[in-house]
A protein has these predicted regions:
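Short, conserved beta-strand segments within well-ordered enzyme catalytic domains
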Residues: 30, 45-47, 56-60, 86-90, ...
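Alpha/beta catalytic cores of nucleotide-metabolism and tRNA/nucleoside-modifying enzymes
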Residues: 1-27, 248-340
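Short catalytic-loop micro-motif centered on adjacent basic/acidic residues
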Residues: 9, 87-89, 109-112, 212-213, ...
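An N-cap/entry alpha-helix motif that binds or orients negatively charged groups
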Residues: 1-50, 148, 155-195, 331-333, ...
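Alpha/beta enzyme core
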Residues: 64, 77-78, 99, 103, ...
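Glycine-rich active-site/cofactor-binding loop and its immediate structural neighborhood
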Residues: 53-97
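A gly/proline- and charged-residue-enriched helix-loop-helix capping module
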Residues: 81-103, 107-121
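Active-site-adjacent beta-strand anchor residues
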Residues: 12, 90, 111, 138, ...
Length: 340
């Protein structure tokens, strides 16, 4: 992997305090396992948006997977389908959303950035729905790009052949502007920086897909999400890449769970590296977690096989953590196993 591509995937914003805190906060939560609970059988499945997931983790939306491997999102989707892992495809993928839909990982959701030009937004939503995507994930923490100093020191250069495929479809609005020859600045400058909750209502009104909002870190915002028709809330700080010193996602999770008050599903991304991290997030009320960087680094090292191995590691670690904690069902993990 080229150094600028590695830095793009690895880095956070400013001093990377939030990036580190996402991991450190998981480490501060210790476990209080139960004994003699018959650990011979465990059910790792969960239900999210009314759909059963074989495993309680999904692939987080990350841009430009071909920077890690020539097969990019195709390899990730094939591995996910093989292991029963869900995928949230990024707007900024290097493979068209229609091609990923043909592989049919399940569930398959589409992550959306809302553009100033609503024709682009409508086009993306319509294409995702027509292709069979099961949900729309709207990222709301990026009205502007965070100050990512690794990318300043090592400017991201995207090869000409690695276009932002979803914005480069010949019949898409303004497709000719989507070639990221000089990095992502041109694409990101088109994001709508004036979004409000009313825009979330509008998005919900133009699709039959359930809409989740990604980037919430507060219970009051989670409550507003429910009031404006969101079916899910993803606790996220963009992997520590936007506002530095923002709260860690696992720290924010209980407040968000309380805010939705059982009226929407809550998921979490940011800092998930081990099976015990998945266990802790579920014990605090998340229905599932999203995993980003570990999947893309596995892709860089081993392609589709590397991603398969990453899925297997996380599944096996989570299964072992459940067994050692005396927990039988992933969808019924008691909070009292946590020392908080």
């Amino acid at each position: 992997m080229r150094h600028d591509h590695f830095e793009y995937y690895l880095g956070g914003s400013d001093d990377e305090i939030t990036l580190r805190e996402n991991r450190a906060a998981f480490g501060r939560i210790l476990l209080r396992p139960r004994m003699l609970r018959d650990s011979s059988h465990r059910d790792l499945s969960v239900t999210v948006l009314g759909q059963k997931l074989d495993l309680p983790f999904m692939v987080a939306p990350m841009a430009l997977a071909k920077l890690a491997h020539p097969q990019g999102e195709l390899a990730v989707a094939r591995a996910a389908k093989s292991r029963g892992v869900g995928v949230v495809l990024s707007t900024l993928s290097t493979v068209p959303l229609e091609d990923i839909a043909q592989i049919r990982p399940n569930p398959l959701w589409f992550q959306l950035y809302v553009y100033k030009d609503r024709a682009i937004t409508r086009d993306l939503v319509g294409r995702a729905e027509a292709s069979g995507y099961g949900a729309l994930v709207v990222t709301v923490d990026t009205p502007y790009l965070g100050k990512r100093e690794r990318d300043i020191r090592n400017p991201l250069q995207i090869p000409e052949e690695y276009v932002v495929a979803n914005l480069n479809k010949p019949d898409s609005p303004r497709q000719g502007e989507a070639r990221p020859d000089t990095g992502l600045n041109t694409v990101i400058a088109r994001y709508d920086d004036s979004l409000t909750w009313k825009d979330m209502e509008w998005l919900a009104s133009i699709t039959n897909m359930p809409v989740l909002v990604k980037g919430v870190l507060r219970g009051d915002d989670a409550k507003l999400a429910v009031e404006h028709g969101m079916k899910g809330v993803i606790v996220s700080n963009h992997g520590g890449r936007q506002l530095d010193t923002a709260i860690a996602t696992i720290t924010a999770l209980p407040d968000v769970v309380a805010g939705v008050d059982g009226k929407a599903d809550v998921l979490l991304d940011g800092g998930v590296r081990r099976g015990t991290d998945v266990l802790k997030a579920l014990a605090l009320g998340a229905k599932a977690v999203l995993v980003g960087r570990p999947i893309y680094f596995a892709l860089a090292v081993g392609g589709e096989l590397g991603v398969l191995q990453a899925f297997d590691l996380l599944r096996d670690e989570f299964d072992l953590a459940m067994a050692l904690c005396g927990v039988h069902r992933a969808d019924d993990i008691p909070q009292d196993i946590l020392a908080i």
